Amino acid sequence: GLGALIFARHPALHSLALISLFGIVAVVLVSYTVQPVLFRMLVSSQTEKGGAPYTLGSLINTLYAFGLFVTGCQLLQALIFTLWPLPMARRRKQRIVQWSIHHMTRGFLRAMVTTKTIRLNDTGETFAEPAVVIANHQSFIDILVLLSICPKAVMVTNGWVWRSPVFGRIVRYLGFYHAADGYERLAPALAQKVAEGYSVIVFPEGTRSADGRIKRFHKGAFYLAAELGLDILPICLYGNGMISSKRQPI
């Protein structure tokens, strides 16, 4: 082919042959190095875990959602910093931040224009009275959904939520509780929050389900309901694990 023209003595043909040979070598290198790595990273590594392969659209949606979420967290931290020197009770400051989170999470979910959200509330629950709110746990998004539904609530969380560099400070400021402290020790502290009108959000499975199926419920939420004298308010979440799961967070 054109590569053979490298032996030609004509300068133009010699240059053309060199370019064609370099092109062939580049194509071979990409085919056996870059392309398999990208296929492994974007397709096979995800399908082996039971997830969907990454696409350009899914990556754009992820960056969009993550950007909105991080921006919201930064605004909340700025709000906390602004409220810090003001001469008002910490309880009132927490309530302002809680109200802001409730409306920001509602706005965040509405901004996810590629995801359809359906809420079924046949009983007309208003979440006005304190209760132990329990839900199945498929995704990190579950936390945002429940905070958007419950206008006044504290949550019992796992360690990774408590220590998150993005929103851990907000969680700690609001007085959310670490499940590792033990529900027996949490009950007296939560009683004070309940007296202030807060509900308590608990994921009885203890962690996110990797396959979307509801796992065994632990007894902590039910212990709290009995100790605090609260009704148990169950919420069933469906589809969040298809957007962001434990196996495939993005």
Q: PLM features: residue spans?
A:
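Membrane-embedded transmembrane helical bundles of large multi-pass transporters/channels
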Residues: G1-P53
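Hydrophobic alpha-helical transmembrane segments in multi-pass membrane proteins
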Residues: G1-L2, V27, S31, C73-Q77, ...
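Membrane-anchoring hydrophobic helices of lipid-metabolizing enzymes
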Residues: G51-A131
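Short gly/ser/thr-rich secondary-structure transition/capping motifs
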Residues: M112-L120, D181-E184, Y238-M242
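A membrane-cytosol interface segment of integral membrane proteins
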Residues: R172-V194, S199
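Residue-level preference for the first positions of well-ordered beta-strands
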Residues: P130-V132, G197-F203
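Catalytic core of membrane glycerolipid acyltransferases/transacylases, capturing the structured
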Residues: Q77-S100, F127-G182
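A cross-family acyltransferase "interaction/gating" segment
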Residues: V166-G168, Y198-I201, A210-I250
